[in-house]
C-alpha cells in the first residue's frame, strides 16, 4: 500500500497488486477486497491493480483475485496469492485511549510546585506505531508496559502557574489516530504553583502593659505576619522555641503565633 507502513492500510490509502505475466494479457479483471478495481499496464507484461480503501471494506488481510486471458482468448488460472509472501492488512478502527489520569508526587496529589514530578497515565486499545505526549507544552517520551503508558515531567520555575495542560496523540499500526486527547477520564487534574509566597507584613510585639517592645516573665510574645497567599505548611520559632500556638485569622492570609 502507499501507507507509511506498506504492509498496512487504512481508509484513504491505496492498495496495489503488482504482477508479471509470461505474455501480454487481455480481459483483465482485478478485484481487491472483493471489489473490481482499476489496473495499469506498465508494458512488457507488467501490470498493477490498485484500489482506494474505504470505511465499507472488511478489516484484516486484504484479499485479491486476478482473472485474465491471453491475446488469443485462452484463460489462465486465477491469481489470488502472492509469490513473495507479501500481504497488506486493513484497519479502519480508530485507536482509543482509556484510564487517562494525572497526578503529582506532591503531598497534595492535585497540586505541584517547582521540582515536583507530574505523571500522566493512559492505556491504548491496540498496538501503536507512534505516540506523542506533551505536558505543559514540553515533549515527553512515555514509558510503555504492554498497553499501559506513563509520561512524567519535572515542573520548572519557568512553567506558567495554573492548570497543567497535556496532550496525547497515538497512531495505531495502520496510522489511524486518536486525535488530540486533552482530558482525563476520571476528572483528575494537577494545579501548578511556581510562585513562592511572600510575607509582606511582619510584626513582633508583647503583651507587656507598659511597652509592647519589652517582655518580662509572664508576658506573651506575639508574631503577626501576612502572606501573599494561603499557606499549607508553617514552621515558626520564637526565641528559638516552638510557639504555643499558630493560627490563621479567618478569611484572611494573616497569621499569628
Kindly label every feature range from the protein language model:
Residues 1-8, 96-111, 198-214:
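Short, solvent-exposed loop/edge segments of extracellular or virion-exposed proteins
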Residues 13-17, 116-120, 219-223:
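Structural beta-strand segments of beta-rich domains
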Residues 21-27, 124-130, 227-233:
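Short proline/glycine-enriched turn/loop motifs at strand-loop junctions of beta-rich domains
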Residues 45-51, 147-153, 253-257:
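Short strand-edge motifs at loop-to-beta-strand transitions and within beta-strands
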Residues 53-61, 155-163:
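Surface-exposed, short loops/turns at beta-strand junctions within beta-sandwich domains
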Residues 63-69, 165-171:
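Extracellular recognition modules
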Residues 69-78, 171-180:
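Short, solvent-exposed loop/turn segments at the edges of extracellular beta-sandwich modules
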Residues 82-99, 103, 182-200, 205:
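Flexible, low-complexity linkers/stalks enriched in Thr/Pro that connect modular domains
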Amino acid at each position: 500500500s502507499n501507507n507509511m507502513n506498506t504492509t498496512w492500510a487504512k481508509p484513504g490509502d491505496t492498495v496495489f497488486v503488482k504482477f508479471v505475466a509470461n505474455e501480454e494479457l487481455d480481459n483483465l479483471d482485478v478485484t481487491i477486497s472483493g471489489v473490481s478495481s482499476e489496473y495499469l499496464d506498465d508494458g512488457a507484461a507488467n501490470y498493477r491493480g490498485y484500489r482506494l480503501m474505504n470505511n465499507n471494506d472488511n478489516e484484516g488481510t486484504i484479499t485479491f483475485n486476478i482473472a485474465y486471458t491471453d491475446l488469443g482468448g485462452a484463460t489462465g488460472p486465477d491469481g489470488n496469492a502472492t509469490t513473495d509472501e507479501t500481504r497488506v492488512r486493513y484497519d479502519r478502527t480508530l485507536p482509543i485511549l482509556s484510564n487517562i489520569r494525572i497526578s503529582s508526587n506532591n503531598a497534595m496529589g492535585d497540586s505541584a510546585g517547582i521540582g515536583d514530578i507530574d505523571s500522566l497515565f493512559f492505556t491504548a486499545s491496540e498496538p501503536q506505531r507512534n505516540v506523542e505526549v506533551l505536558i505543559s507544552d514540553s515533549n515527553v517520551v512515555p514509558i510503555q508496559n504492554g498497553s499501559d503508558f506513563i509520561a512524567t515531567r519535572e515542573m520548572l520555575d519557568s512553567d506558567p502557574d495554573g492548570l497543567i495542560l497535556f496532550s496525547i496523540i497515538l497512531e495505531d499500526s495502520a496510522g489511524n489516530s486518536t486525535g488530540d486527547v486533552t482530558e482525563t477520564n476520571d476528572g483528575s487534574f494537577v494545579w501548578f504553583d511556581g510562585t513562592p509566597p511572600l510575607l509582606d507584613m511582619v510584626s513582633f510585639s508583647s503583651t507587656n502593659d507598659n511597652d509592647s517592645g519589652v517582655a518580662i516573665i509572664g508576658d506573651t510574645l506575639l508574631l503577626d505576619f501576612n502572606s501573599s497567599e494561603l499557606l499549607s505548611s508553617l514552621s515558626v520559632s520564637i526565641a528559638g522555641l516552638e510557639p504555643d500556638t499558630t493560627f490563621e485569622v479567618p478569611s484572611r492570609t494573616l497569621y499569628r503565633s
